[in-house]
Amino acid sequence: MESIILNLLNLTGEERAAFAVLAPQRFHPDGDGLTVEDWQSAQVILGNPPPECLRGSTALRWLHTRSAGVDPYTAPGVLPSEAALTCSTGAYGHSVSEHLFALLLALMKRLPNYRDQQNRALWRDLGPVKTLLGAQVLVVGTGDLGSSFARLCQTLGARTSGVRRDPA
């Protein structure tokens, strides 16, 4: 019997073709149009289905989420006990840390304030701006994302310290 794979990822045509070479699967970006029977017959799901759609899915053997967090899927009764749950931890650290870094620099240089002034046709000096050179940056979370963010800050001369939830 062929495994039923539901691929909920939002893919390009080229990406779909690459997935299809690996194994036959049904593509339903974000789960649109799937019935209760579709959910309950799936053995593999790639993506982030609504947890309530998985209750009673006794055929499910593997759920891989496109997100790092899986809390909604760990509640009792959401997944069958035999199902493996994997996630995309580590896939987003660099790109998200670049976004955080850009926001940090924008705030340090007061770019939102200057943009607001520009919208009002004002050009007032808002005083000195900060630099990362020699700054002390506290990073909350030392996983993939936090570590990547700390490296970016260090590149511009900041000293970094990190804190995390558990001491491990």
Task: Set out the residue ranges of the language-model regions.
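Loop/helix-junction capping segments adjacent to catalytic residues or to phosphate/diphosphate-binding pockets
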Residues: 13, 94, 147
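An N-terminal-biased, well-structured beta-alpha scaffold segment characteristic
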Residues: 1-86
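Rossmann-fold NAD(P)-dependent oxidoreductase module
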Residues: 18, 99, 103, 148, ...
